[in-house]
Amino acid sequence: MRNLKNIMRRHISLLGFLGVLSLWQVAGLLKLLPKFILPTPLEILQSFVRDREFLWYHSWATLRVALLGLVLGVLIACIMAVLMDSLGWLNDLIYPMMVVVQTIPTIAIAPILVLWLGYGILPKIVLIILTTTFPIIVSILDGFRHCDKDMLTLFSLMRAKPWQILWHFKIPVSLPYFYAGLRVSVSYAFITTVVSEWLGGFEGLGVYMIQSKKLFQYDTMFAIIILVSIISLLGMKLVDVSEKYVIKWKRS
């Protein structure tokens, strides 16, 4: 009995998830919910199998754009964070504008970027950069602010140059904060890519979702939503794995 309780306690999340899926499937079989509102889990699974080639093709297209935008966003965010930390006037100038941009919904910015930059890959990349830089910049700046003041004084007394203080002290201290922001930005990157694909294009999960909607393939639409969630979760998991290898001292 005790072993059974321990097993249930360890796997309570899995049991709850399976319970929800079971109720969902039963509700669908009893036709309590129309298919266009909520297809059954079995129908969504069948869609994964039936449309696997299309899902793979469009997933790879979305992944390419998301990764490119994320890499550029991370590079820009790191450079901006260092400059804003070093130059107080730059921080006072840029930070309020960044906050204003973050308050504007992504779906509202996307059409403007398409109008300015066309229907190619450029507006998608710009949109991803706009959504992914802010969490990383804020996290890195927060890490810089948590640097020990006594250590900074010690570096100054040792006549260390600014780049030496940055490389040997500030960056190592801010790495955990950087990874916290990176987790958020990874999920933003994939979601933003799909949103940008809604506005037009020839490939990508967002484009495929719109096509499925027009064909009333609601099971495929839900399969795409689940696939985007899985990709985002895998991306966040990769960030966790990377953090464990990069910041080995954090475990101790």
Give residue spans per PLM region.
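Transmembrane alpha-helical segments of polytopic membrane transport and secretion proteins
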Residues: M1-L18, K237-S252
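Periplasmic/extracellular loop-to-transmembrane helix junction in inner-membrane transport proteins
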Residues: R2, L30-V74
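Transmembrane-helix boundary motif in ABC transporter permease subunits
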Residues: L68-M98, L115
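C-terminal transmembrane helix and the adjacent membrane-cytosol boundary/short C-terminal tail
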Residues: G88, R145, F222-S252
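Generic hydrophobic transmembrane alpha-helix motif, especially the helices
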Residues: V99-P135, D142-G143
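Glycine-rich helix-loop "coupling/hinge" segments at transmembrane-helix boundaries
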Residues: L115, I191-V228, I247-S252
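Transmembrane alpha-helices
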Residues: V126, L130, W163-V195, V228, ...
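Short cytoplasmic-facing helical segments at TM-TM junctions of multi-pass membrane proteins
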Residues: G143-G181, L205, M209
